């Protein structure tokens, strides 16, 4: 590998989640901010939490004139 072209790797980078959870990892960044982590992600918590990007489901339902009863 050539010297001087690779970014500096930090072994103790603090990761902050929107839920308040923090943990450390390794990265070329000095600090990381994430929206969802293993403490608040529905897959790991078992709780149902809707993460809808811009109301895409509602947009789809309106486009095809569907209601919740039609889908079930």
Swiss-Prot record:
The keyword Ligase does not apply. GO terms for cellular component: ribonucleoprotein complex; ribosome. GO terms for biological process: translation. Disulfide bonds: none annotated. It comes from the Bacteria. It holds the Pfam family Ribosomal_L31. HAMAP family: Ribosomal_bL31_1. Binds the 23S rRNA. Belongs to the bacterial ribosomal protein bL31 family. Type A subfamily. This is Large ribosomal subunit protein bL31. It comes from Clostridium botulinum (strain Loch Maree / Type A3).
């Amino acid at each position: 590998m050539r010297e001087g072209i690779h970014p500096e790797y930090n072994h103790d980078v603090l990761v902050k989640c929107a839920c308040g959870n923090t943990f450390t990892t390794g990265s070329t960044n000095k600090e990381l901010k994430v929206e969802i982590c293993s403490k608040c992600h529905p897959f790991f918590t078992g709780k149902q939490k809707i993460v809808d990007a811009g109301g895409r489901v509602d947009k789809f339902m309106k486009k095809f004139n569907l209601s919740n009863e039609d889908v079930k």
